[in-house]
């Protein structure tokens, strides 16, 4: 299911905050997000279950939790405004929902950067079937 969602996004073109999130990750980590994070571990990409495999996968778990806490927002499609100031992401705009989505994406991009040294290639295309069915709580 996760793979189909990612392929659909790639075929249709990325819109809204997904494109902005991709740009944040690329700038913070130097990695191409679709290749490096779209299928990483048990939580990166669409959906997630089980225990995060490592610190990078935990970044995705926390990001999913952040999105879950947003009410009345469409975090994958609502575009937001942000800028870079002295190497830091600054979320802007007047819409509180869009600003919160930006803050979730910002936190994840920073988390990916901070955990680059623990990134494991073996989790890049980790099969969902190997993730346990019982998920951690946010």
UniProtKB/Swiss-Prot annotation:
Paired cysteines (S-S): 42-131, 44-60, 59-111, 65-138, 66-104, 73-97, 91-102
Tissue: Expressed by the venom gland.
Pfam families: Phospholip_A2_1
Residues the entry annotates as binding Ca(2+): 43, 45, 47, 64
Keywords: Blood coagulation cascade inhibiting toxin, Calcium, Disulfide bond, Hemostasis impairing toxin, Hydrolase, Lipid degradation, Lipid metabolism, Metal-binding, Secreted, Signal, Toxin
SUPFAM superfamilies, per the entry: Phospholipase A2, PLA2 (SSF48619)
Active site: 63, 105
Catalytic reactions of this protein: a 1,2-diacyl-sn-glycero-3-phosphocholine + H2O = a 1-acyl-sn-glycero-3-phosphocholine + a fatty acid + H(+)
Enzymatic class: hydrolase
Annotated compartments: Secreted
UniProt record, GO biological process: arachidonate secretion; lipid catabolic process; negative regulation of T cell proliferation; phospholipid metabolic process
EC number, UniProt record: 3.1.1.4
PROSITE patterns (alphabetical): PA2_ASP (PS00119), PA2_HIS (PS00118)
Annotated cofactor note: Binds 1 Ca(2+) ion.
Range of residues in the leader sequence: 1-16
GO CC entries: extracellular region
Swiss-Prot/TrEMBL cofactor(s): Ca(2+)
A GO molecular function held by the record: calcium ion binding
Principal location: secreted
Function: Snake venom phospholipase A2 (PLA2) that shows potent hemolytic activity, and exhibits medium anticoagulant effects by binding to factor Xa (F10) and inhibiting the prothrombinase activity (IC(50) is 90 nM). It is one of the few phospholipases A2 capable of hydrolyzing the phospholipids of E.coli membranes in the presence of a bactericidal/permeability-increasing protein (BPI) of neutrophils. PLA2 catalyzes the calcium-dependent hydrolysis of the 2-acyl groups in 3-sn-phosphoglycerides.
Family: Belongs to the phospholipase A2 family. Group II subfamily. D49 sub-subfamily.
Matches recorded under PANTHER family: PHOSPHOLIPASE A2 FAMILY MEMBER, PHOSPHOLIPASE A2, MEMBRANE ASSOCIATED
Name the UniProt record assigns to this protein: Basic phospholipase A2 B
């Amino acid at each position: 299911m996760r793979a189909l969602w990612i392929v659909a996004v790639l075929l249709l073109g990325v819109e809204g905050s997904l494109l902005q999130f991709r740009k944040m990750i690329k700038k913070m980590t130097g990695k191409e997000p679709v290749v490096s994070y779209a299928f990483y571990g048990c939580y990166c990409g669409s959906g997630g279950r089980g225990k995060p495999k490592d610190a990078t996968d935990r970044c995705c778990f926390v990001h999913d939790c952040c999105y879950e806490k947003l009410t009345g927002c469409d975090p994958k499609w609502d575009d937001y405004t942000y800028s870079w100031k002295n190497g830091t992401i600054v979320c802007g705009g007047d819409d509180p929902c869009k600003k919160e989505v930006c803050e979730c994406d910002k936190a994840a991009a920073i988390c990916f950067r901070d955990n680059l040294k623990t990134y494991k290639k073996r989790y890049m295309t980790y099969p969902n079937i190997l993730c346990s069915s019982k998920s951690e709580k946010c």
